[in-house]
């Protein structure tokens, strides 16, 4: 199936629940998934839960029968064991709320109903009740809105860190897909070059066999040709295996099956124009957009929030406490009349102070946090420093690969000219070693030209990756998906929508598609096509017989020994026996 690079990237985004990156001829997972950010996001509600009100109710019923020994009023020498019964109902209700200032406000209600069936008491039943409001406000340790909201801020920073870690992994994935695509183009180009080399040496081998048969060459020449031919067949086998490995690696990183009925045929043309580099703008983009740099900044912000907490923990504990309570009592008098009284209110104010002598542990943690911030700052500086060097390496590589591409174009022209010269077959015996070297140089020149251009295109993706803009330049964005789950109101309420996944989406149309494989951009034509054309013209001429006179036997030999080059033994334009018969007729 013919696929452009845009098609391949779109397929990869559709299958990217788990982020994969290319590692050689395989692909491995980065450990990042589309659910990571949503999982971390739950920590925000966990931190906010510290300020949720707490409600408690204790409701109890008690029947108490307490035995007791008393002297017998009739016989003092005897003792009676009597019991009293007490029926009691108690209700304790409390509501507590922590405030962002660090204070805690408590509201409580206590109610009790006591009955004494076997006793005569002033009130039976006796109902007591009280309601109280208490405020505890820290003045030193635990005081302040910033320090109390710091855990929420840290949780939000952790969510942002998770997002940028996922974004960094997606950037590596996109770069891997682009690299794997161009590596497949390179493998297909190298396979074509090796096939051409094998076909050229196959003809040289057949020619050597014909010459040995007519006694025009030594067996050593034939052995040399056969060794070279078999060596290049082995190289061709490696090239065929390499293209399968590269396609398998690309399928792996795309999330496709390793085998199906379709072969991937790249159709996007390679970029062969030099890209202008603006160094200062590249540095500015990297400082602003690189996910790893942003993550280092977020780590510094999170540790600064932790320093607020550590600094507050190193303070003594000093709390102001205020209480106001309403008390009430009612019941039934022995005469059966009810009685009720209220207005018995009380209040209290106080200050509670506590401090560990020395505050050794809390101050050690504060000192540790201060050093962590210093470490974060130097790590951020090192990250910026390393980013600038990574950009410099990428820029130098771009310049190198493009220069190599232009140079290898000249090398290929020279190798083609050399192969043309060495492939001229006349009546004289050419040096097979020279021809072999020409074939090797030509194949290497084609492969090197393709490799330089592929490396140049892959390095363009690396440059975008180093600046942190590879997703933006390809039109890739992130969409937050949501799912319904139990919320603060409980299971009986309507489920609340929470973040579920953050997949990368977008319709990439950056890379055009052609109707030919990508490697055809490298002008992959038959290196000896003109000799095949000469052979076609030679087949239309009459072959010299035994009675044909020739003023220049070498010219006749050259005409009848025109280069025959096919796609294999069964595809040669004339068989070895035909060449042999022609040569025998001329030698007569």
Description of each model-found segment:
Residues 1-19, 23:
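Regulatory alphaC helix of protein kinase catalytic domains
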Residues 83-87, 125-127, 276, 341-345, ...:
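Short sequence motifs at beta-strands and strand-loop junctions characteristic
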Residues 63-65, 250, 257-261, 265-279, ...:
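Acidic, low-complexity, intrinsically disordered peripheral segments
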